[in-house]
């Protein structure tokens, strides 16, 4: 089983307040890729994703942070989606990931951590889908924070790949701005992961999460097991007794 890989990424700096956030998708998206969008708006209020997207979470106070995924059909590369929100500035990051079928085993996120500090710290995630256990997961760490901190932040240890950050700028009051940052961990086969903390330049209200994208199942997984009797092959479903 091979680790999933990042095909491409995109960021959107939403520097103008709007109730309809136009979010960039990655330039390269292949059919079957897992698309994930991470979105933070500088005001609370539920985010609305287009049809076909499945939300991991949608959490507010004082800002709103959400994430959603979709199995790509291959037409999405270089396009945008519109996310509805309470009118505000925003920041978004999008990933296209190959090597998993999200329709079989959807990606997973942690419950999420929150606080007010200069160290947004994602919580632990032990994926349960596909039976759980140690696998070649692709791990991502996310932080969303209110304010005008230096962007990008310092990322958690080992999260050195595919680092992406977006922000809403510095115009207007500090509370009208936000930041979001995401990074991929170096490959790690494990049953769970608890990233270290991000480091930002100024303390403020934040939320942080850990994500896991499952590896594709091995060839033949779930297929009938072939047995031989007297040299003649025949199929027998794996769960059947006697075998």
Regions flagged by a language model, labelled:
Residues 1-243:
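Primarily extracytoplasmic/secreted proteins
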């Amino acid at each position: 089983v091979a680790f999933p890989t990042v095909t491409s990424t995109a960021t959107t700096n939403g520097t103008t307040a709007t109730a309809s956030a136009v979010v960039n998708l990655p330039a390269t998206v292949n059919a079957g890729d897992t698309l994930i969008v991470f979105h933070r708006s500088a005001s609370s209020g539920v985010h609305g994703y287009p049809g076909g997207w499945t939300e991991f979470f949608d959490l507010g106070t004082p800002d709103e942070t959400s994430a959603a995924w979709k199995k790509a059909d291959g037409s999405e590369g270089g396009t945008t989606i519109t996310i509805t929100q309470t009118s505000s500035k925003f920041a978004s990051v999008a990933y296209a990931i190959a090597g998993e079928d999200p329709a079989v085993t959807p990606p997973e996120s942690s419950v999420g951590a929150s606080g007010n500090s200069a160290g947004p710290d994602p919580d632990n995630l032990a994926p349960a889908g596909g039976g759980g256990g140690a696998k070649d997961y692709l791990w991502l760490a996310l932080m969303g924070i209110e304010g005008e901190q230096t962007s990008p932040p310092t990322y958690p240890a080992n999260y050195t790949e595919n680092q992406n950050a977006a922000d809403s700028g510095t115009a207007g009051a500090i509370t009208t701005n936000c930041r979001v940052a995401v990074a991929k961990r170096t490959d790690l086969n494990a049953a769970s992961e608890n990233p270290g903390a991000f480091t930002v330049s100024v303390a403020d209200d934040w939320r942080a999460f850990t994500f896991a994208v499952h590896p594709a199942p091995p060839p033949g997984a779930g297929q009938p097991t072939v047995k031989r009797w007297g040299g003649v092959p025949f199929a027998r479903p794996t769960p059947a007794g006697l075998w």
